Amino acid sequence: MSIQAIVLATFDAKEGYNVENYYPGDFNVEGIEYLLFPSGIQELDNCTIFFRFQDQLCLSVFSKLQHPSFERSAFFTSVGLILSDDINFGEAVVKYGETLLYIANGLSLATLKYKFGEDASETYASEKCTSHQLSDSDFFKSLQTSAVNLEFDSLFEKLQGNKFAILGANSKELSQSYATILLDHLGPAFYCLYKFALQRKRILLISSHDDQLYSIIDMIVRLSSIKRSSDASIPILLSDLHPFYSVGLANTSTLLDNDLEEGWIACTTDTVLLSKSSLYDLALYWPDNSFNANKYPQIFNSNSIRIKPSYDDLINFKGLSRYLSFDGESSWGLTTYSLASKYIFNTSHHNLTDQEFLNENMLDYFQRYNQKLLTVLSSNAESFNVSDMQTLGLNPCHSLDKSFVSEISQIWLKKHINWQYGKYFWLRRVSLIFLASTCFLFILWKLL
């Protein structure tokens, strides 16, 4: 059984949140009406919401309906399917999305007719007919008929009897979709997010509502997963990062009280959660609706202190974008950052991307890197040196990268790292910084 329950909830300025109907009748839906509606509903016309209710996933469609007869001329409906199968957002949309749209359309129409009369429902129906192409499928027609008649038991039976598509885990199209999201919305912040996910930390994404936030969660969970290896020296002790998807102030206690060893990732529109530093280890924040403007997020640690991507993160992102983008972007930026990092920070061109990436699925590529990371750590934990860091595309002098390696070794392999950098390694770094600064001042003096 794929679907546990179907729920219809409404909101208006006079009556507040209400669960209008649900099926089966013995299913406990207490409190779900607050989760079915996103924060800032007055600013949204419609959207898809994905969240956990009683540790089960729920996919819902929210709609804002406007008519002079409504309280403050606005009435809100949300129809949710509580799922029993443990799938991610992308799979849920493909599997149930179109079906849920038809059900939500019919139930909203029937609710308007019941509460506000024929005129309001006809206005809503005409708007939907012009904005959506209705399917001629007998299945969808029967769904809408049951929805319009508020036959929840019939809807539930039809949903249970339908054979939904079985989806592949790693498709090329999915990889391309993730690549677009990474380039447009994450930028160099991606590598910081990816590293914290590998460390199984608590991660919070804060932005105005956008379905692609759920896709970012799906992507990070998959990219940070580690497949079980045949190598007995690499035990897999942790599960994938736990996705909570959409959360709000009502979920604060759940997030604080959980003891998930595998960490979690969630998104919210409640910016006040950014001030609750004990709630998360890493927060990505898109201020002032900038998520839709293709701007990169600000990054905050658990002390609510803003951090910025390292030079190596910039190098790796430039390399990644070089392979993922199709606009023929110049590699000058990559060269500039590589030279700066090589001669000032003692790294080399061992980036997290290489020529092999061109012929690989992005999801497979990062899972292969994760396996390589554990293999190198398992072999060299007792004597980890500069060359080992460079092999992994990490900065041997950057404190966040060193902390990353130490934590990965501890939580995945239960080993402590024994750093072997050489007695005078720090002198090399200082001398190179001095040399680079001198060259910069000399060039500046010549230019002036």
UniProtKB/Swiss-Prot annotation:
InterPro entries: LCHN/Anr2, Lipid_Metab_Assoc_Protein, Tripartite_DENN
Pfam families cross-referenced by the UniProt entry: DENND11 (PF09804)
A Gene Ontology term for the protein's cellular component: endoplasmic reticulum membrane
Subcellular location(s) of the protein: Golgi apparatus membrane; Endoplasmic reticulum membrane
Transmembrane segments: 425-447
Domain uDENN: 4-155
Membrane topology field: Single-pass membrane protein
Ranges of residues in domain cDENN: 183-326
Primary localization class, coarse: Golgi
Every dDENN domain range: 328-428
Keyword annotations of the record: Endoplasmic reticulum, Golgi apparatus, Membrane, Transmembrane, Transmembrane helix
Entries under PANTHER family matching the protein: DUF4484 DOMAIN-CONTAINING PROTEIN, PROTEIN, PUTATIVE-RELATED
Name of the protein in question: Uncharacterized protein C119.16c
